[in-house]
Amino acid sequence: MAMKKFVKKRKKVNFFAKNKINYIDYKDVELLKKFISGNGQILPRRITGTSPKHQRQLAVAIKRARQMALLPYVID
């Protein structure tokens, strides 16, 4: 039986805590685009590494930006 290779996973870092960002602004479109998938969906915590508090704030900011037409709902 072949041995499986062990790959050490890199610990995900909370982007907002690392950069000391307290408020996630819905008008900061470039920052919000980093947390959206290619289809336009909000990326989950397990992928981005954000804390639960910042993930909730991020989701609210992305939804506000979508309503204000700063971000698209879907990306073609």
From Swiss-Prot:
Which keywords belong to this entry? Ribonucleoprotein, Ribosomal protein, RNA-binding, rRNA-binding
**MF (Gene Ontology):** small ribosomal subunit rRNA binding; structural constituent of ribosome
Give all cystine bridges in this chain: none
Sorted alphabetically, the Gene Ontology BP terms of this entry are: translation
Any matching Pfam family: Ribosomal_S18
**What cellular component terms from Gene Ontology apply here?**
cytosolic small ribosomal subunit
The answer, when asked if Ribosomal protein is one of the entry's keywords, is: yes
Entry keyword Ribonucleoprotein: yes
By sequence similarity, the record places it as follows:
Belongs to the bacterial ribosomal protein bS18 family.
The entry describes its oligomerization and partners as: Part of the 30S ribosomal subunit. Forms a tight heterodimer with protein bS6.
Q: What does this protein do?
A: Binds as a heterodimer with protein bS6 to the central domain of the 16S rRNA, where it helps stabilize the platform of the 30S subunit.
Identify the PANTHER family for this entry: 30S RIBOSOMAL PROTEIN S18, SMALL RIBOSOMAL SUBUNIT PROTEIN BS18M
Protein's recorded name? Small ribosomal subunit protein bS18
- Source lineage: Bacteria, Bacillati, Mycoplasmatota, Mollicutes, Entomoplasmatales
